[in-house]
Amino acid sequence: RDGRVAWDWGAGVPVAHLGVSGAGLYRLPIGRFSLRAAFSGDRIALLEPIVVPVVGGEVALDSFLMSGALAAGVRPVWNASASLRDVSLEQLTQVLEWPPFGGVVTGQLREMRYADQVFTIGGGLDFSAFDGDVRVDDLSIQDPLGSVPILRANATLRGLSLEALTQTFSFGLIEGRLDGDLDDLQLVGWQPAHFSVHLYTPQGSDARRRISQRAVENLTELGSGIPAGLSASMLQVFDQFRYNSIDLRVSLDGEVAQLDGLARPDGGYYLVK
């Protein structure tokens, strides 16, 4: 690390220069970056974007303004905006010890704010993944720099490629498109503690819909037996099957998860019809 930080509590606004050869945040390795900022009184203002290499891509801090810095008895408040460019989901999930994802994330983080130890994104987060679109709303992180941060968010998934998704998770091949609604997500210490998610085939989609034998077997383990219309002997004969729709609902509360799908006449449910 090298540079010069000048701070004036008077009328002058000196410019600080700082170069960082490398760092880490939440186990994420961060590459070399530099910054130019103005320090005046209890305010810090970024003068030009900071571009930080991270997990195969870049995170750019486009704007940043903090007030209450180093002021006695005052909690700092800051506002910022940032962007993500080609951040590797595979590397990110590996470092955070999450289930492995493939692909990259490119998106905008607007109206970011930190106050009273709570980080929020007022404008939401839009990015692309698995050849579809993901929007995250109502994102907040309580005590983000503490030992047990609490993340809350809602999200919508639109037009995700099931082929890309199932190949990433080695679940067994499924072809088609997938929509989803994730409500009341809560991560405690970056581990899932609560959520409700509905995953389903979008209406009007003309994408090819095929499901492999392995995927049927894995869904069968999640559900309550062989899907209606299929027998164990048929599973051994055919490698792939056509399907009409997918409908999967999962609710997690603590260590208890509940699974549901499309209602069947016999009182059960379909995960794949």
Segments and roles (model prediction):
Residues 1-273:
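Membrane-proximal interfacial segments on either side of biological membranes
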